[in-house]
């Protein structure tokens, strides 16, 4: 049995930026403090939502180190360290671990899609380079590559491969992974609209975008489930759906950064090639925030 890196709601945190595109570390610190105050169970820095794909390594590592220092062991810090270049990924994994991250989030290789055997070799090499627990990230809608349940089983035998963030949207696949891997691979939902279904299959929590705007909602949903109050968990899951829909009306993190700006945070804009949402989608996002009581005007 592998102890989970965290249990509950981890936030896939945004990276706030100034007008010139540089990281606004002061605002990042304020957002982290607010997340912890609202009982977020883990901070995931430099993931998809954090725009790691447009960060050079030195900037990414600076964001990881800053987050580790601000969090100061209050909750686990999970650092995005994925790459479609295994050698580069190994170097990034090692340096992220040196920054003090508690675990690494590693996406499957993208564009130069490999085979299932290649996935085993890739994740094994990167896990051993990092030397700390790894959560694999399966998001075939972005990468064009799926981690098959049988591959998850093989990788779960490695002592450092601790979990999988499952964002395939395929509940049947998640069930198969749970059946094959049991307690040797901790499953986290990568979709805010599928938190309770994955918990019901033995999942340990969610890596959430919605947590950026309403962390207590996602935390309370997970807590209710683990406390045995499935009716409340179901209610909170359904309450989450309008926010989840709005925050994915365009490619993540475009909507969530806009939402954070509306809520008064200095989130800034996304780096190109991502641009701000359309006017229609801005209205849609604001409507969802208003319905949840997050804005009143």
Where are these regions (language model features)?
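C-terminal alpha-helical cap/extension of soluble enzyme domains
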Residues: 5-16, 34, 38-40, 200-203, ...
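A general structural signal for well-ordered alpha-helical segments in protein cores
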Residues: 28, 60, 64, 89, ...
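Active-site beta->alpha loop and helix N-cap motifs at the rims of alpha/beta catalytic domains
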Residues: 2-11, 15-144
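Short, flexible micro-motifs
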Residues: 11, 15, 24, 50-53, ...
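Glycine-rich phosphate-binding "P-loop"
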Residues: 138, 160-161, 271-272
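Alpha-helical structural signal in soluble globular domains
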Residues: 62, 66-71, 95, 99, ...
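Catalytic alpha/beta core domains of metabolic enzymes, predominantly
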Residues: 128, 142-248
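Short secondary-structure transition/capping segments
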Residues: 55-58, 91, 116-119, 147-149, ...
